[in-house]
Design a protein with these regions (language model features):
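Short, charged, intrinsically disordered terminal tails
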Residues: 52-60
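Non-DNA-binding regulatory cores of transcription-related proteins
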Residues: 1-53
Length: 60
């Protein structure tokens, strides 16, 4: 698995999602980049990316 996790959102919601993710998962993330409808999360390690992916899926 790569260090990247992408989250697709409803248009206009990615900025808020990115901000919340960055605050709550700061220790696992190297960077968070968002546009209007998607959030790209770059994890510090592949393990962190996998954990982040699983945690985000649990919210669905």
């Amino acid at each position: 698995m790569e260090k990247y996790v992408v989250l697709r959102t409803i248009p206009g919601n990615a900025a808020e999602c990115g901000s919340l993710i960055e605050k709550n998962y700061q220790e696992k993330l190297f960077a968070v980049i968002n546009d209007d409808d998607s959030v790209l999360m770059i994890a510090r390690t592949e393990e962190a990316a996998e954990k982040l992916h699983k945690e985000l899926l649990s919210y669905l």
